[in-house]
Amino acid sequence: MNKNLMIVIAALLVIFGLVMSGYNNLVGMNENINGKWSQIENQLQRRNDLIPNLVNTVKGYAAHESDVFKAVADARAKLGGAKTVQEASQADGELSGALSRLLMVAENYPQLKANANFTQLQDELAGTENRIAVSRQDYNNAVQEFNSSIKQFPTVLYAGILGFSQRDYFEVPESAKAVPQVQF
């Protein structure tokens, strides 16, 4: 067999091996991102499950605060219907804002703050918010690793051809970045 042909075949086999290895690496990173996203969804669902109990507890003391309760319900519905990372991120920001307003309403009712059920729900909500923050961080780290990988040589040459594209970060909406005004 021709020596040049052997060199070409060997080079093609090496290139094929590198592409397959890179492909498998991208598949693994993509699945890692999907797993991290599932963890965010699990924590968001946990928070969603806590909210009705919290709202009902506050309603018992502050029934006339219907606009706050409606904002929480609307934000929960929007989060439940989110289909993309951007929609979920936006809805999560709205729900966090509505929950903050709900907890501010609770501050006006000393009997409510002394209610053991309310205190327990508030603690569970705080713990869940912390788990959501950690899950977001893990997700965004996985997305950053994946996005960096598909932009690096030689992966950039074949990632798009094999169906891999940049993934979206779970970003905080602009409304959540605003510093709340506190008046004494």
Descriptions of predicted regions:
Residues 1-184:
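A helix-centric hydrophobic-segment signal that preferentially recognizes long
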